[in-house]
Amino acid sequence: MAGHSKWANTKHRKAAQDAKRGKIFTKIIRELVTAARLGGGDPATNPRLRAAVDKALSNNMTRDTLNRAIARGAGNDENDNMETIIYEGYGPGGTAVMVECLSDNRNRTVSDVRHAFTKTGGNLGTDGSVSYLFTKKGVISYAPGVDEDAVMEAALEAGAEDVETYDDGAIDVYTTPEAFGEVKDAMDAAGFVAESAEVSMIPSTKAELDIDTAPKLMRLIDMLEDSDDVQEVYHNGDISDEVAKQLEDIL
């Protein structure tokens, strides 16, 4: 999940492990290639590519690797038949889950996604079953230690929709998808270095999970993310400080 929610913090360890395996880079490269193929190789005129570039840089991908992926996509490789597919369903604890995939084989992908839901006690739903609970937004995250007032002032002046602060000093800046690149550029120019920046699906309501259901949702997310076809998993699961601490102890 994007941002600095308690849930996102419990996933940092898993994200670090994924990065070591190269899985995150593989997924980002596929998104760069597809975005460039569909909208051209210039991030300035291709919002989807711009978001992918920001995500690549946030994950410390080298410019060389990034540029090669864009060049591959902009070259209109006829063998690249990837399409974006969104699956929706309900996970453990009644959580709403959206799964964004890039695939060249729908049958393989839906089989993998359905298997993950079934194995963890969830259900794969139909189009529209949970998407109404999410809104697409840009999320620019800053680590604890930045000047809260300065970030808020710069973000709102740049056209951000909202700014959320956390007890530990972390900050999330929210934008419309269309304004994401412009706001990110303005924040960079103002000297604020983002910890991460991406366009994400933000839930409008949260489903509170206890210590029994939270690990089950984590297993569902892990199973989905282990599929090469799955690019992003969005959910509305939420955990209390107490459950977050318990999860950290058992992870």
Swiss-Prot record:
Instruction: Tell me where it resides.
Output: Cytoplasm
What the entry lists under InterPro entries is as follows: Integrase-like_N (IPR017856), TACO1_YebC-like_2nd/3rd_dom (IPR048300), TACO1_YebC_N (IPR049083), Transcrip_reg_TACO1-like (IPR002876), Transcrip_reg_TACO1-like_dom3 (IPR026564), YebC-like (IPR029072)
**Domain of life per record:** Bacteria
Q: Which UniProt keywords apply?
A: Cytoplasm, DNA-binding, Transcription, Transcription regulation
- A Pfam family per the record: Transcrip_reg
Q: Which GO terms describe its biological process?
A: regulation of DNA-templated transcription
Location, primary (coarse class): cytoplasm
Q: Which GO terms describe its molecular function?
A: DNA binding
Q: Name one GO cellular component term.
A: cytosol
**Family classification:** Belongs to the TACO1 family.
Q: What is this protein called?
A: Probable transcriptional regulatory protein PMI1113
Which organism's genome codes for this protein? Proteus mirabilis (strain HI4320)
